[in-house]
Amino acid sequence: MGVTELGKLIGKEVRREVKLESLSGKCIALDAYNALYQFLASIRQPDGTPLMDRAGRITSHLSGLFYRTINLLEAGIRPVYVFDGKPPEFKLAEIEERRKTREKAMEEVLRAIKEGRREDVAKYAKRAVFITSEMVDEAKRLLSYMGVPWVQAPSEGEAQAAYMARKGHCWAVGSQDYDSLLFGSPKLVRNLAVSPKRKIGEEVIELTPEIIELDAVLRALRLKNREQLIDLAILLGTDYNPDGVPGVGPQKALKLIWEFGSLEKLLETVLKGAYFPIDPLEIKKFFLNPPVTDQYATEVRDPDEAALKDFLIREHDFSEERVSKALERLRKARGKLKTSSLDSFF
C-alpha cells in the first residue's frame, strides 16, 4: 500500500532517526509484501535481472529475507512478518491497473534486453516487479525454518500489523509506507527491511531507521484525531483512490480539513456532487474497522538448520559457504535473544 502524498506532509521534526541497535528487544510487525517488493526491486544482477537458481526460479526475495532478517535478529529486534490476505473489493480495480503497468514495464525490459540497453533493463525491471503465490509460500517456509514468526492477515497486512501494535503485542509496525498510521499503529519504523544503502542517480545514500509516532504526526499537522488523518489521506489519495481529489494538493487538503473538520462535512459542502469512483466514506470505514485476526504468535523460536540448508542450498542453489556463515550468525543472534530481558519489550 502507499499514501505517498501524505508522506510529503510528514516533516523532519517528526521523523526520529535511530540506530538499528537502539531497537533491541523490540517486537516489530513487518509488512511482508512491502519487504518482499523491496528485495525483488533492489537485489539484482549487474544486467538488471533478479537472482535466480538453476531452474530459473527467482530467489532475490529469499536472499533479501534471509540475510536482512538475520541483521534484524543480530540487532536484538524480534521481527514478525505479516502477509496480506484478501483485499477489499474496492481495491480490485487498482490492483488490475498495477498489473497492466507491470506488464508494460516487462515489455520494455524485453525490448531493452534485445537492443542491449543495460541501464534501461535495470530501470524497467524494477517497475515490472511482481509477487507470485509461490514466492509468498517460499517466504513463509523460509521464515518458519528460521524460527521467525509470520502472520496471515485476513485482509490488508498493514491493518493487521497496526492492530498488533495497538494491542501492545508489537512495539511498532515496520514498513516503507505510511498506511499503518491510518490503521492506528502508535509507531511506524521505516527503513528496516531495506538495504542500508540506496543508489539515487550516481549518488549512494545511507538509509537509517526512522521512527514516526502517530501522536507526533497529529500534533505537527494540527489534527484532532486519527479520523482527520484518514480524511486528509483520502483527499490526497490512497491505495483505494490513488488519484485523490483532482486539484487538491497536500497544503490545500490540510486547510480543508482544518476548516471543515471532517470528510463528511466536505462531502456535504465544497465536494457536494463531486465524482468519486469509490465511495470515500467506505474507504474511511475500512481504515477505521478493517478485518483482523487474533490468531498470531510473536515468539522467535530456534531455527531448523537442516531444513534451512536443504531449502536454500539444495532447492535454490545458494552458496553453501555463505549459508553456513549466515547460520552461525543466526545461531548467535538467537542465543542473544534468549538471554535478553523481556522488560526491554516494553
Swiss-Prot record:
The protein's Enzyme Commission number: 3.1.-.-
Gene3D superfamilies: 5' to 3' exonuclease, C-terminal subdomain, 5'-nuclease
Superkingdom field: Archaea
Entries under SUPFAM superfamilies matching the protein: 5' to 3' exonuclease, C-terminal subdomain, PIN domain-like
One of the protein's GO biological processes: DNA repair
Region (I-domain), start-end ranges: 120-261
Keyword Isomerase among record annotations: no
Region of interest: N-domain: 1-102
Cofactor annotation comment: Binds 2 magnesium ions per subunit. They probably participate in the reaction catalyzed by the enzyme. May bind an additional third magnesium ion after substrate binding.
One Gene Ontology MF term: 5'-flap endonuclease activity
Residue numbers binding Mg(2+) 1: D31, D84, E156, E158
Cofactors, names only: Mg(2+)
Record bears the keyword Hydrolase: yes
Binding of Mg(2+) 2, residues: D177, D179, D239
Family under the similarity heading: Belongs to the XPG/RAD2 endonuclease family. FEN1 subfamily.
Job of this protein: Structure-specific nuclease with 5'-flap endonuclease and 5'-3' exonuclease activities involved in DNA replication and repair. During DNA replication, cleaves the 5'-overhanging flap structure that is generated by displacement synthesis when DNA polymerase encounters the 5'-end of a downstream Okazaki fragment. Binds the unpaired 3'-DNA end and kinks the DNA to facilitate 5' cleavage specificity. Cleaves one nucleotide into the double-stranded DNA from the junction in flap DNA, leaving a nick for ligation. Also involved in the base excision repair (BER) pathway.
Record's subunit section: Interacts with PCNA. PCNA stimulates the nuclease activity without altering cleavage specificity.
NCBIfam families: fen_arch (TIGR03674)
UniProt cross-references to PANTHER family, sorted A to Z: FLAP ENDONUCLEASE 1, FLAP ENDONUCLEASE FAMILY MEMBER
Name of the protein in its database record: Flap endonuclease 1
Protein species of origin: Pyrobaculum aerophilum (strain ATCC 51768 / DSM 7523 / JCM 9630 / CIP 104966 / NBRC 100827 / IM2)
Gene field: fen
